[in-house]
Amino acid sequence: MALAKRIIPCLDVDNGRVVKGVQFENIRDAGDPVEIARRYDEQGADEITFLDITASVDNRDTTLHTVERMASQVFIPLTVGGGVRTVQDIRNLLNAGADKVSINTAAVFNPDFVGEAADRFGSQCIVVAIDAKKVSAPGEPGRWEIFTHGGRKPTGLDAVEWAKKMEALGAGEILLTSMDQDGVKSGYDLGVTRAISEALCIPVIASGGVGNLQHLADGILEGKADAVLAASIFHFGEYTVPEAKAYLAARGIVMR
């Protein structure tokens, strides 16, 4: 029996507003996060991911108040990330109503933080977010490098090997964003998505690049992702979550 696949709208939040950019730049306002989250809950989204996109850069904590407001009005699992650096940060977010917490930059600086967090709170609520950029030349086998600080800083780390290490340390899920594809609407980077999905036993969420419903299907059927994340196509009304679920189900994908 195939595990049901998930559709996860993503809210990139900057100063309390949902925004959407292209390749991590050129930001456009999409509205109030709580209102948008409530709409996706009503539409039947499986989960919501809330990323405070400037928290790591500005070195400030994720807005707990927004998370509390969202959690009080949204009744599907909520993953929150951005500026998560300590066990106390995780505890604060879980207490505010997050179901899972996403760790990105802090995992690179201190990989053992992931293990400590998983030991303390359980792997099921620890998501490691990976921002990957293709670094192999045309014709070479695919190689992808990890970037941190909202995609600003290269690390020299190989994305596939890093994902395997995060799984070994206790991450319960990988949120994989292709920086090359982010916001450009030409589909996920299926190469890195498949490489990481096939290397791991834990779920992989594909992110970065959805422009139509076929891209969601490709992420699952070709990228082997367990869940597909999208932002622009839902935020700006091009498609609804029910339309996406119906499209995927019609292609034989088992949906929740």
From Swiss-Prot:
Active-site residues annotated for this sequence: 12, 131
Pathway the protein acts in: Amino-acid biosynthesis; L-histidine biosynthesis; L-histidine from 5-phospho-alpha-D-ribose 1-diphosphate: step 5/9
The entry's cellular-component GO terms read: cytoplasm
Pfam annotation, one family? His_biosynth
- EC primary class: lyase
Q: GO molecular function terms here?
A: imidazoleglycerol-phosphate synthase activity; lyase activity
Q: Describe its assembly.
A: Heterodimer of HisH and HisF.
* Similarity-based family: Belongs to the HisA/HisF family.
User: What is the protein name stated in its UniProt record?
Assistant: Imidazole glycerol phosphate synthase subunit HisF
